[in-house]
Amino acid sequence: MKKVFVGTVICFSIFLLTGWSLAADTIKIGAFLPMTGAVAAYGQDANNGIQGAKEMRPTVLGKKVEYILVDTKSDKIEAANATSRLIEKDKVVAIIGEMISGNTMAGGPIAEKAKIPVVTPTATNPLVTQGKKYIFRVCFIDPVQGDIAAKYAFNTLKARKAALIVDKSQDYCVGLGKFFKDAFIKLGGQIVAETFCVTEDKDFSAQLSTMKPKNPDVLYAPNYYSPVALFTKQARELGLKAPVLSGDGAQADELIQIGGKEVEGVAFTGHFHAKAATTKLAKDFMALWQKKYKAEPNAFHALGADAYFVLLDAITRANSTRGEAIRAALATTKNFEAISGRLSIGEDGNAVKPMVIMVVKNGKFDYLTTVNP
């Protein structure tokens, strides 16, 4: 009887060490993404990218991956609720999401408390990972993005006077605007106007009437695609011809659909362009995408897929589905050959990786250059 009891304890201990999910037929990975609402384009594209990645690699540790998606409706409260559901009801071992910083920060603390790792494809605000052990990202952070954008404006566009329009309702936009502003001033530039909006705004006449008399050399709009498109369109209609520069939030097809020919020439910092792809994983992913959709993948497709691949790499190296083990593996990701380029992730949860600069040209996103870390 004693031998049976000891054997049971040993088996149970091994079971705990390797993770509960290993006893199941599948390994559950969740995602909380904005499939509807103001930034639905990001979530829909990332989800398609994840589905493509899952098609390329449907198993991990010898088991099928079960992918569970919950719509955040582009809302912070819904993002928190989605995170709770994935952890408490669906019993996932890790989570992908969210796409924007504010929503990621709404769900992050819940996952942190439960010790469930989260990998965000595109939440770039530094606060997303600050002070967290279980939150990671496969994108660059806004201080880097703002600095590169300021250098591009100052050195390439030869801008000395910048005007800003910042979406004050979004953490991402506020942070990126500040980082650009600080970097531009440090370079010797001047901020001649700083105006604000919210994501739902459609009329930017008040902001433009403040900017135009200042005769700026560049207009920096660190916002999501809809306000960037509408702002640019109205700026051109008002006769304000200064170049418009934005961040990674602008890279959605909807920017061109909403802005039309008026967004020609809009440049922005971003994560991925097919012309800049160099890794084998990128080439394999693009081949899959071409076969399925007869098109090139965009940044949100690529980063959604990267989040999935990085998670599976961590689970494989950990040889476990325990949250603590996956977290430790994520924090020691070194030179992973991702779709968006070679990346490393440290204990701070942040990815060190290349950045690309793109421009709208002939109704498409055209590649300009790559900036390496």
Describe the role of every protein-language-model region:
Residues A111, G177-H271:
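Extracellular/periplasmic bilobed ligand-binding domains
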Residues M1-K28, V60, N372-P373:
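Short, low-complexity disordered leader/linker segments with a strong preference
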Residues Y42-R57, E78, V118, Q145-A149, ...:
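Short, solvent-exposed amphipathic alpha-helices that sit
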